[in-house]
A protein has these predicted regions:
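Hydrophobic/aromatic ligand-binding patch that stacks against planar heteroaromatic rings
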Residues: 28-31, 147, 188-191
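Conserved P-loop
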Residues: 2-96, 100-107
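Catalytic micro-motifs at enzyme active sites that drive phosphoryl/nucleotidyl and oxygen chemistry
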Residues: 6, 145, 185-187
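Phosphate-binding/switch region of NTP-binding enzymes
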Residues: 151-192
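Phosphate-binding/switch loop-helix module in NTP-utilizing enzymes
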Residues: 69-153
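Glycine-rich, phosphate-binding/catalytic loops in enzymes
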Residues: 56, 110-114, 174-176
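A broad, low-specificity signal for short, low-complexity segments enriched in glycine/proline
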Residues: 1-3, 17-21, 118-119, 153, ...
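Glycine-rich loops and low-complexity Gly/Arg-rich segments
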Residues: 44, 62-67, 118-122, 182-186
Length: 192
């Protein structure tokens, strides 16, 4: 058998994508049209999707907190994510709405875990280590998305809000630069 006899068209697999846009532009509504979606909500938004395409959604994720004994109670995001990997269901698309809101929850978690810091720059020992910890959380999320894609064959859609900067170079026309609205640029690569 020759090498060329082994050529075949690859089967289409599940996708991992990021939808980015301004508020109210229909990012969640677009994601709701994907095959059999279920939303993990880091912010409210599913209720604004037209009723005829409104998807199933898990309860809105809340931030971490400490119990009466001072034990760190993690937010439900990872619990919801793990349930979609481990438990039987017929959903075909996981939508995370939104990574911009989830980023804020991650920041709150880091500051709560540190206990002393009041900003990311001084968190986790200072010298910007909080930003690296934040970036690691986003990398873990991207790896978890790959895991659910491989193990469950699910599409994963990350919804992100856009941050628009006006750029005025001296030798060119002004233009707008769009990027994902995140706390720090180190958190962007997993979603691009």
């Amino acid at each position: 058998m020759s090498i060329l006899d082994q050529i075949e068209v690859p089967k289409r697999g599940a996708q991992i994508i990021t939808i980015c846009g301004d508020a109210g532009t229909g990012k969640s509504s677009l994601a709701a049209t994907f095959p059999k979606p279920v939303f993990i909500q880091a912010e409210k938004g599913v209720e604004r999707i037209p009723a005829e395409i409104r998807p199933a959604a898990l309860p809105q994720v809340v931030g971490s907190h400490k119990d009466a004994d001072g034990n760190f109670i993690n937010n439900t995001f990872w619990d919801q994510f793990k349930a979609l990997i481990r438990e039987e269901h017929d959903y075909k698309t996981l939508v995370i709405d939104s990574i911009s809101a989830l980023d804020r929850l991650f920041v709150s978690d880091i500051l709560l875990q540190d206990g002393k810091a009041n900003n990311l720059n001084s968190a986790m020992g200072g010298y910007g280590a909080g930003f690296s910890t934040l970036a690691t959380k986003h990398q873990q999320l991207r790896k978890a998305a790959e895991m659910i894609r491989q193990k469950r064959g699910m599409n994963v859609v990350f919804i992100a809000h856009a941050e628009v900067d006006r750029v005025s170079p001296p030798d060119q026309d002004d233009y707008s630069r769009y990027s994902l609205r995140m706390t720090h640029s180190k958190s962007l690569p997993p979603y691009l």
